[in-house]
From Swiss-Prot:
Disulfide bonds join C74-C79. GO terms for biological process: cell redox homeostasis; response to oxygen radical. Keywords: Disulfide bond, FAD, Flavoprotein, Mitochondrion, NADP, Oxidoreductase, Redox-active center, Selenocysteine, Transit peptide. This is Thioredoxin reductase 2, mitochondrial. Inhibited by 1-chloro-2,4-dinitrobenzene and by zinc, calcium, magnesium and Fe(2+) ions. Its cofactor is FAD. It is found in: Mitochondrion. Its EC number is 1.8.1.9. FAD binds at residues 29-58. It comes from Bos taurus (Bovine). Homodimer. SUPFAM superfamilies: FAD/NAD(P)-binding domain, FAD/NAD-linked reductases, dimerisation (C-terminal) domain. GO terms for molecular function: flavin adenine dinucleotide binding; protein homodimerization activity; thioredoxin-disulfide reductase (NADPH) activity. GO terms for cellular component: cytoplasm; cytosol; mitochondrion.
Amino acid sequence: MAALRGAAARFRGRAPGGARGAAGRQCYDLLVIGGGSGGLACAKEAAQLGKKVAVLDYVEPSPQGTRWGLGGTCVNVGCIPKKLMHQAALLGGMIRDAPHYGWGVAQAPHSWATLADAVQNHVKSLNWGHRIQLQDRKVKYFNVKASFVDTHTVCGVSKGGEETLLSAEHIVIATGGRPRYPTHIEGALEYGITSDDLFWLKESPGKTLVVGASYVALECAGLLTGLGLDTTVMIRSVPLRAFDQQMASLVTEHMAGHGTRILRGCAPEKVEKLPGQQLRVTWVDLTSDRKDAGTFDTVLWAIGRVPETASLNLEKAGVHTNPVTGKILVDAQETTSVPHIYAIGDVAEGRPELTPTAIMAGRLLAQRLSGRTSDLMDYSSVPTTVFTPLEYGCVGLSEEAAVARHGEEHVEVYHAFYKPLEFTVPQRDASQCYIKMVCLREPPQLVLGLHFLGPNAGEVIQGFALGIKCGASYQQLMRTVGIHPTCAEEVAKLRISKRSGLDPTVTGCUG
């Protein structure tokens, strides 16, 4: 805490609007490297607290040449375009349901070009909005590629090669990450795309192979299937490894039952372009060693992400990274191995790769450096949602993690299979709509985790996340009156435990 107070005091002592340093060097109170969600939040908060702040941001084009504006992964090639395309896919299902509700709606084909144009225009409006927000808060924006010169100095190189030297008392690294390419696979880099490219395609990707078991892989595959495209997911081992595995199985089961082909236990070996511009992919079945091949219009790699640290010259500043992951090592205060250099968001070791956590961490860091608070970011019980066709929202521990931490005899799991009311009239399949509440067995049965698979999962989980963060018990949730008729009310009606062995299927209504 003494070090924190000292850093804050030095930061507070610098006059805003500072002067140029030696040799034309520009001096700031705070430099933020990276114009994504976390970096922008930190920069805007610090500026609002009276500091002279600069943001350095540069987007290296993807191997396929895709580039975008200010705002980072979430705005440009992540959460925002993904959710909009997910919504487009859900609308397709609603159109198919419409006749059952009395609407004589024609089943029109989907136009990728129209959707892509609308999504890209919205993203560009957000890029512009970020520029305006920085300008309004008097944050200086540099569209340059940054690298460290020493512990307090950064060199920014523009697209035209012009160099700018900038110094600051404090520096925040918020460069995020980029999709990983399997460069050991022949043709992967030349012919494959990633989520960095998908949302900026002007034409439909057509028949698509998605390689990977991450939430990015399943979300992309799900929305492509929902838009009417022939889509295959190739999974080497375990889908959604970081999530509750029962829920992960239900997610993939639902996808497989609703049009997405899933190849399990397979690994690609080669991608080659055919004369007609299609791609031939050769893969091996890891259980039988049998080789197979298929033809696709697009191959999308979703096998994980790597931190954007390679070009930062971190060694010049003495900033340490994890040699395995490449991520920057930080403590609870987001401080790196250098006391006045910090890292937040996806680039930091051990942090959730989630936009809201990066934003909150950035704001809290700016407030601590300005002496406004000593509060640290709490990374426990962070809610999240996987936007697959049937959405999966969760907060807290998975069943596996709870058992590993507390022991099976000390964990009680309440669960239910339920049918959303809106699924009844069109007779939609609801066999994977499922809720699971993981609790300590001893009264009052503290809730350790909540998992929800069904429509609007993110909206459902957000509300319960507050209760779980505040230490809600199973008994308290069972005494919470639900809103009827909703899917969310089923959470407050979980009476069947796994231990009981009783059928958890919800029957009846209004009683």
